[in-house]
Amino acid sequence: QSVLFNPALVALHTDKIVHFEYFNRYGVKELGTLGIGFVYPNPLLSVGVDISSFGYDQYRETLFRLSVGKQLNDRWRIGVGFQYKMLQTELSEEVPKQLSTDIGILFTPVDKLLIGMLIMNFPSIDIHKYTTEIKCFTGYSVQIGFQWKIINSLLIVGTFESNKEHTWIGNMGIEYVPFRNFRLRAGVQTAPLLPALGIGYC
């Protein structure tokens, strides 16, 4: 995630893009994540907007995200993301909401290799909470990861993460581009051990 969801990524693009994403880390059709977004590159400040939805009618998490990024030089990029999240469930009529900020850095030491650092949900503010003691949103997360393009159509991605619940979590995945603009993704994470599959189009 430190590379894939890093707000500094918007500073990598030179063309306007619209992208569609779907992934499912639980292998259950009701627990997939569907997203759409676009990126508007600009030499002064690039901008990206994303909307994603996780779950089904009885339980749904919705995320609206605005990302801004700046290229500092040939190797360094920085970015900030602002999120608005809400949770809807049949268990309660209340709709918890949260505002949060992500801070990201990207470093390109050599061609075809990206190294990223991401601080998620720092800070975060609960706009509306459950009156019960149900935890609705995750806390802060610090992630370091990489993205390596082995060949033109194959990427390897890895991430190490630390958060309030886990000292560290590992993620590893691949992305294959069978034809232009279409991506197939597969990966696995630890704590708990979960595989994931996904597709993307842009």
Write out the residue ranges for each language-model feature.
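Subset of outer-membrane beta-barrel
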Residues: 1-202
